[in-house]
Each structure stands twice: as structure tokens, then as C-alpha cells.
């Protein structure tokens, strides 16, 4: 049985750890609220933009764009979103699992024909340590801490340029999506070529487009692509902070349970020590009579 000193040391150690997890929980909560605010401000714009674009393309059936053309897949680019740090539950392991499944899906391609863009230090470290070489393109880990539309636009422009120049034939986005505080999903979404959805309303409107149809539609397509990858980044950041918030709360609850057990154990041990001391005093007193 541990001594009183050992129990006190464990209690002190757990309380110290609990302070750290509480601070991390507060920090995760603050970052989560900030990311949710960014998403809430951005989401109406993205939805309206996509609805407008889909409506135009549904009505203008003869419009053609190189960004919508499907080609035989000979070279692919994967953009994977993870976190920069740990202590966020299964957040990173889930995205790594999805990445491995995706790589297996394209095993018919040569390794040099798979480009990997990592947005997050954890997935970057994992890819660099693989036994088979996959080239990591660019450095975008800073976007996780500070989501920046302009910086992410540079990545989107690189992907667009490579796709239009037929250096790659397909682009896919891999990320975590937070449905609620308990449930998260790993998503794989096609990015290029563009896949347009049919609008809910099937009525054909007679649009007057200025300055000209192609200029407006190409601009809308580009903005839609920029907004999509930015929304994916914000989704991943929200999922990360939610996972960390839940993990820290679980750690705090576990610490409370252990502290309760140790406190009971400490009190019992202390009571036993006092009882033994009293018995020794009584025994000594009886012996002196």
C-alpha cells in the first residue's frame, strides 16, 4: 500500500496536470469560437455563390470550360488537412486512415504521379516518413493556426494551373468534418474537375449577363473553387478544436475521478495511521500502570 507521502505526491501531480488540461480546454474553446465565427460569416456567401453558378450552368447548356472536362486519370493531386499538434483524440488518425485508403485506391498509378499537398504538420510528418516516397508539395502548415484566404488562394491557383496545363488530371480534398461535439466524419471531396449540382428549381430563367457570358461564368467558377477550399479548411479547423475540447474535458473528468479515489485512499490511510498511533499510546499507558 502506498504511503501518505506517495499519495500526496500523486494528488499534487494530478492537480498540476488538471490545470494544464483546463487551460488547453479554454484555449481550444476560444479558437473554436473564432473559427465558427469565420465559418458563419463565410457560409452564406459560399451558398449564394454556388446556387448562382449552378443556376447559370443549368440554364446555359452550351457553356464549356476546361475545368469541367473529365480526363483519364494518369496523375492526381491530393490535398490533405490535419492539425499541427496532438491531443485532439482520433482527429489525425482518422485522416491518416482516409489518406491510406485513398492511396490504395490509386495504387495503379506510379508514386511519382501522386502529388500530395499537406495542410497540417501531423499529416506532413506522416507522409515524409512513409516507406514509399511521395513528394510533399509546398508548405501550408501555417494555415491551420491562422486560416488565410489569400494564402490558400495561392494553393488553389497552383492546382488550377496544373490542371489546365494537364499536369494533373484530378484533385481531391481530404479533411475532417464536425457534425456535432460527439460525431465527426472524414470526407473525400472532388475538387477538379468541377462537378456541378442541378439546382432545386428547374425553371429556365432568361438571364441578361454583362459584360459577357463567358467572362461572368469563368469568374464565378474561380470564386466557387476558392470558396470551396477555404470552407474545407475552416471545417477542418473547427473539427480539430472540437476534438481537442472534447479530449480535454474527458481528461479533466478522468482527473476528477482519480482525485476522488486518491482522496478517499489518503483519508483512510491517515485515519489508520492515527488509529495505530492511539493504540500505541494506549498500549504504552497500560504497560506503565
From Swiss-Prot:
The keyword Transport applies. It comes from the Bacteria. InterPro entries: ATP_synth_F1_ATPase_gsu, ATP_synth_F1_gsu. One of its GO terms (biological process) is proton motive force-driven plasma membrane ATP synthesis. One of its GO terms (molecular function) is proton-transporting ATP synthase activity, rotational mechanism. It is a peripheral membrane protein. Keywords: ATP synthesis, Cell inner membrane, Cell membrane, CF(1), Hydrogen ion transport, Ion transport, Membrane, Transport. One of its GO terms (cellular component) is plasma membrane. F-type ATPases have 2 components, CF(1) - the catalytic core - and CF(0) - the membrane proton channel. CF(1) has five subunits: alpha(3), beta(3), gamma(1), delta(1), epsilon(1). CF(0) has three main subunits: a, b and c. This is ATP synthase gamma chain.
